[in-house]
Amino acid sequence: MRITLTESNTQSLLRGLRESAVDVAFVRPPYVLDAEFESERVLDEPMLIALPPDHPLSRKRSVPIAALADEDFVLYPRPIGAGLYDAIQNACLRAGFAPRVIQEAPQMASIVSLVAAGVGISIVPAAMRHMGAQGIEYRPIKGDAPHALLDMAYRRHDRSIAARNAVDMLRQLAHPEAAAGA
């Protein structure tokens, strides 16, 4: 068995599933699965505000979305990340403004790097705070925070034993309470 981790966008990962180049893919909704595939939710996490360390809002414990109305945003492009993009847009619209997107980046690591360089601020999945990026501060969103959803997609049938075991293990990691009750 060989495990290879590849970072890509949802459309590319689903193409990899269809072409049998990928056995299990972590994808973000919305997406359309062909009938031979299935998916299940593995993560529903609040998003955080990513700020350069010298930003005035980095001194606060938590930040309401409305406080970002005059900020420049660095976001994931909608065509390759509609779920994250729409969650951020909708949260900002509920707070009374449309985010001023001055830069888009196709990978979360690039977004974090651009924020650290002072290009703008962003709203990112909470897991990004564990990436060890230097020169960046993360703050919880005060009030109604958008959520980042992550699903595991895989072939419904015709999976190798290794792929079946990987799906089972990942399912147990994502839902330990269900595994304990089984």
Stretch-by-stretch model annotation:
Residues 2-4, 98-102, 137, 149-151:
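Residues at or immediately flanking beta-strands
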